[in-house]
Design a protein with these regions (language model features):
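N-terminal post-signal-peptidase region of extra-cytosolic proteins
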Residues: 3-18, 47-55, 114-115
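Exported/periplasmic cell-wall-interacting domains
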Residues: 36-133
Length: 133
């Protein structure tokens, strides 16, 4: 399974409030959105009831379709203190901004197309290992 993704426009890094995409070994800690329609918009990890069907004119960091929340597994790198991916709310999630996939545009999360994040969601489970390199 291959997919175009988008990572942080600020580069790679693990520090809290850096808005960078963390590196290293992670696991899927929670999975949200099972059974919801493609394009379902989330706010604070809850579905809003809205479904986004086309690319929005705004550059907002929309979280759509599915959320796979990541937990860092490397103490001192992406786990613990101000380097903790879980406490930074780092996700793999859907985006309606398909035109930005393949470039660095997120605020730290890993963005995928709605179709691809749904496919990935159906292939993995909690505790699945994720290496961000």
């Amino acid at each position: 399974f291959e997919s175009k993704i988008s990572t942080s426009k600020y580069g790679m890094g693990c520090k809290m409030n850096s808005f960078k995409t963390p590196t290293g070994l992670h696991s899927v800690s929670s999975m949200l959105g099972r059974g919801l329609p493609a394009g379902t918009l989330f706010k604070n990890r809850r579905p809003t009831g809205k479904v986004i069907k086309k690319i929005p004119h705004s550059n907002s960091d929309y979280i759509t379709s599915r959320i796979l929340r990541l937990n860092g597994l490397e103490e001192g790198k992406n786990k613990g203190g101000d380097l903790d991916s879980y406490n930074r709310y780092i996700y793999i999630h859907g985006t309606p901004h398909y035109n930005t996939l393949g470039s660095r545009q997120s605020q730290g999360c890993i963005r995928m197309s709605d179709r691809d994040v749904i496919k990935l969601f159906d292939l993995v489970d909690q505790k699945t290992l994720v290496l961000i390199d």
